[in-house]
Amino acid sequence: AGVSSSDGRAGGVVAALSARGLKGVPVSGQDGDAAALNRVALGTQTVSVWKDSRDLGREAATAAVSLAKGQKVAGAKTWAEGAKKVPMEAMFLKAVPVTKDNLDAVIKAGHISKDAACKGVDKAAAPAACK
């Protein structure tokens, strides 16, 4: 399996596996970028963890305004799970693991067009989102 911290790195894993003629190896990434979502549709990447950047932007702006006013950030929680267990305030937004089974979620959200997500996909073996 190839577990990557970003979809860009996952693309490198997919390219390396392809160069070796290896198929069916689970590969994960994060970001929900267009190339990765296309790889999910093609079946060369198993999952991309997506966080809607519009939600991230809204929450970041709201947090910045609260902090500028000297207020606590609504919804922030204390998190101390790092290697040194240093407590800090954090907000965790919903992450969506996008697979071939729910690829339509990012299309319906307007994050990517169906044409871009499904480019080059064989219609006979296509996930439901590409039919």
Question: Could you say what each language-model-derived stretch is?
Answer:
Residues 14-22, 41-45, 62-69:
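Sec-exported extracytoplasmic/periplasmic mature domains
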Residues 42-54:
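Short beta-strand elements at the ligand-binding edges of bilobed clamshell
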Residues 33-36, 52-72, 76:
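Hydrophobic alpha-helical segments within soluble ligand-binding/sensing domains
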Residues 29, 49-50, 99:
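Structural signal for conserved beta-strand scaffold positions within catalytic alpha/beta enzyme cores
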Residues 1-39:
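Hydrophobic alpha-helical
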Residues 63-131:
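Hinge/cleft segment of the Venus flytrap/periplasmic-binding protein
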